[in-house]
C-alpha cells in the first residue's frame, strides 16, 4: 500500500517523494564526474520527466559527452553515442535490412537509435537528410525501415550536441527538427575556479572513460522516472499561468526582430517544462517564476531572427529577455 506524506503543505505519495529525492540527488551524482554545468544537468532531468529531447550547444571540450554518459550511469539506463559526420547515412542511425547467408533470409539489424539515452554528437556536422532520420524517432518513438514500424525502448530521449553555427563544416538544423527538441541548453566555457577543479581531478587520476572509478553509481532508474512522471501530471496549472505562457509566446511573434516566433507546440513545451520544474522544487502548483525559469531553454531555439536583426547583433535570448520584461506577470 502506498502511504502519503505532507511536503510543502500538500499530500504526495511516499513513492513519488522518494522519486523526487532521488532525482534531486542525481545532480550531485553527475557532479562526481562533471564539474559545474548544474543548469544543464537540471535541464536534462526536466526533459527526462517530460519525455522530451534536448539540444546542447557548446564549443568542443566542455564535457557535453561526459555529461550524458554520467547521467546514464546515474540512472542505470542504456546509452549509445553516434558521431555525426558528413558521410553518415540514415541507415547508420535507424538500422537496416541485411541478408543472413546462414539462414538465407533477410533480417533487420537494429541501429544505435535503439537505446534509452541517444547521444547524437555534433548533429550539425551531418547533412539534413541524415539529421532528419531522427525526426520520426523523436516524434513517434519508433522508426520505420522497409515499411515496417519498430518501437523504441522506454524511456527514449535524444540528447543532441552541436557546435555553434559559426564553426566551419556545420549545417543548420531544419526548423521542423529544432521544434521537436523540448529544450536547448547552452554549456559555456568553465569559470577559472571550475577549470582548476577539472585539472585537479585529472591530475589525481580521474578517467572519464571509467565513471565507476569516479564513484558514479545509479541513484534512480526507470521506476523512479515512472513515479515522477505520474506525480508531475498532478501539478496544478492555474488559468492565469496558462495565459501567461500564451502571452509570452504570442509576444515573440510580434517582435520586430523575429521572422518566425514560437508556435503552439513551443507554448506547450514551456508549460510542460515549468510544471516539471515546479514538482522538482517541491510544489504542487506552477508559479510565473517557474515559467520564467524555463522560458529561455524552452523557447530560444524556436525564435528565428530576421537577417537584418542578426546583422545588428540581436539574439534569441535577447528577444526573450525583452518579452519577459514587458509581458505583464499575473498576480
What is the meaning of each model-derived region?
Residues 59, 93, 161:
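P-loop (Walker A) phosphate-binding loop of NTP-binding proteins
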Residues 43-46, 99-119, 148:
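Conserved alpha-helical scaffold flanking the Walker A/P-loop in AAA+ ATPase domains
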Residues 2-13, 17, 24, 69, ...:
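C-terminal engagement/docking regions of AAA+ P-loop ATPases
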Residues 100-105, 126, 138-220, 225-235, ...:
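Canonical AAA+ ATPase core
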Residues 52-54, 78, 114-118, 132, ...:
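Loop/turn-to-beta-strand initiation segments
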Residues 45-85:
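Walker A/P-loop
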Residues 16-59:
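Pre-Walker A (pre-P-loop) alpha-helix and adjacent loop at the N terminus of AAA/AAA+ ATPase modules
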Residues 58, 121-122, 133:
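Walker B catalytic acidic pair
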Amino acid at each position: 500500500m502506498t502511504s502519503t506524506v505532507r511536503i510543502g503543505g500538500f499530500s504526495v505519495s511516499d513513492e513519488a517523494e522518494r522519486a523526487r529525492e532521488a532525482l534531486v540527488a542525481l545532480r550531485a551524482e553527475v557532479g562526481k564526474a562533471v564539474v559545474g554545468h548544474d543548469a544543464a544537468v537540471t535541464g536534462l532531468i526536466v526533459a527526462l520527466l517530460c519525455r522530451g529531447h534536448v539540444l546542447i550547444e557548446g564549443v568542443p571540450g566542455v564535457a557535453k559527452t561526459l555529461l550524458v554518459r554520467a547521467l546514464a550511469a546515474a540512472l542505470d539506463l542504456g546509452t549509445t553515442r553516434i558521431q555525426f559526420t558528413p558521410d553518415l547515412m540514415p541507415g547508420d542511425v535507424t538500422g537496416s535490412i541485411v541478408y543472413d547467408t546462414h539462414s538465407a533470409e533477410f533480417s533487420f539489424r537494429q541501429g544505435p537509435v535503439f537505446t534509452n539515452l541517444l547521444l547524437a554528437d555534433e548533429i550539425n556536422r551531418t547533412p539534413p537528410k541524415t539529421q532528419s532520420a531522427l525526426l520520426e524517432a523523436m516524434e513517434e518513438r519508433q522508426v520505420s525501415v522497409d515499411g515496417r514500424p519498430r518501437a523504441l525502448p522506454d524511456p527514449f530521449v535524444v540528447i543532441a550536441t552541436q557546435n555553434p553555427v559559426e564553426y566551419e563544416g556545420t549545417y543548420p538544423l531544419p526548423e521542423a527538427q529544432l521544434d521537436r527538441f523540448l529544450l536547448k541548453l547552452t554549456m559555456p566555457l568553465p569559470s577559472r575556479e571550475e577549470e582548476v577543479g577539472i585539472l585537479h581531478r585529472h591530475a589525481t587520476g580521474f578517467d572519464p572513460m571509467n565513471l565507476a572509478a569516479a564513484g558514479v553509481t545509479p541513484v534512480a532508474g526507470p521506476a523512479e522516472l515512472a513515479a515522477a512522471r505520474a506525480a508531475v501530471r498532478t501539478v496544478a496549472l492555474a488559468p492565469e499561468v496558462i495565459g501567461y505562457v500564451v502571452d509570452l509566446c504570442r509576444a515573440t511573434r510580434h517582435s520586430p526582430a523575429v521572422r518566425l516566433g514560437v508556435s503552439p507546440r513551443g507554448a506547450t513545451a514551456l508549460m510542460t517544462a515549468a510544471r516539471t520544474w515546479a514538482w522538482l522544487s517541491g510544489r504542487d502548483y506552477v508559479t510565473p517564476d517557474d515559467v520564467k525559469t524555463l522560458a529561455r531553454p524552452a523557447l530560444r531555439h524556436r525564435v528565428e531572427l530576421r537577417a537584418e536583426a542578426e546583422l545588428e547583433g540581436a539574439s534569441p535570448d535577447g528577444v526573450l529577455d525583452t518579452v519577459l520584461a514587458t509581458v505583464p506577470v499575473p498576480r
